[in-house]
Amino acid sequence: MTYEIQASVREAQGTGASRRLRREGQIPGILYGEGQEPVAIAVDHKTVFYALEKESFHTALIKLSLNGETKDVIVRDFQMHPFRREVQHIDFQAVKADQLVRIRVPLHIVNAENSQAVKLQGGRVSLLNTAVEVLALPANIPAFLDLDCAEVVAGDILHLSDIKLPEGVESVSLKRNENLAVATVTGKKR
């Protein structure tokens, strides 16, 4: 899914200026990367707030329109208000199509309900890490990674090497020879 966001350069900075922006339905943000100086921007709160609720937005390649120019960006960070449903600030990183990007991708458990551990041993699969840091070209960044648990039994520990990575995607930890545990399987051993 592709996302398009309109942004404008903001001149006024600081706490007071940021509060005024938020009252006007805007979010203060920053755009950095691509060897350029960071640019203070403002984006529409409603557009970003509802997009952030979608898991795919966090790893998607976003088209950011700024001063009539469109840039490919990814969400690098964002801050939420402690108790209101409100985005306080957002950081975008400009990316080039031919340069690798390091990003955290969500991890999903699949086929756990069909495994011996769950069906016969009354167990369950628990994630130790909800996301995996990967290295990929912007066009190859997956929305999520699947951890297939069809063959697991109680007592198993699943590692990064058990995740099938799509073509053109590498695990940062596996490149450093760190095969970290990502999930455990609990239940009665038979």
From Swiss-Prot:
Part of the 50S ribosomal subunit; part of the 5S rRNA/L5/L18/L25 subcomplex. Contacts the 5S rRNA. Binds to the 5S rRNA independently of L5 and L18. This is Large ribosomal subunit protein bL25. It comes from Neisseria gonorrhoeae (strain ATCC 700825 / FA 1090). The keyword Magnesium does not apply. One of its GO terms (biological process) is translation. Belongs to the bacterial ribosomal protein bL25 family. CTC subfamily. Keywords: Ribonucleoprotein, Ribosomal protein, RNA-binding, rRNA-binding. It comes from the Bacteria.
